[in-house]
Amino acid sequence: EAMPMIMEWGMGMAGPLIYLEYPFIWLNQKLTFGDTFGLTAVDAINSTDTPVLILHGDEDTTVGYDTVSIISKKNEITNPNVRYLVCDVDRRNGHNSLFYSLEALDYVDEINEIGSRIDERYGYDVPEEVLREYYASVDKFRVRELDRGFMESILTFYRDAVK
């Protein structure tokens, strides 16, 4: 169900004032999604015998691990073909860092620091040519280097699912 997640995000952005917006958010969601508005991921997962892999970082601050994530509803999931893969490795256990190697995350920190220095040098009005040079200097392969062990766990799930 989307409303708890929307409200959690809203609380982070607007604090308790988000509750004043609740009726309008609810109406918008209902008009946008119609009959499917009340469906939940748990209902969908339980309605099938299809293998399902649920991934989550235990320090995810975007989709709260213990609050609104699918994995927080683990005790409601009855599909016996569900597998859970929780990343608890420091720095890789957030929302957007699950798949990347620690080396990639270190490199991203380095290039972000360089980018911050460029921003500060130009007062956040960086000339296009400087931006072009900066982005051209980024090693796209290093930025996206995957954590092989984590990816192997995912591949194992898929290989088992198609047997």
Where are these regions (language model features)?
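Short, conserved loop/helix-junction motifs that constitute active-site signature segments
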Residues: 46-48, 77-78
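Short beta-strand/loop motif that positions the catalytic acidic residue
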Residues: 47-49, 54-60
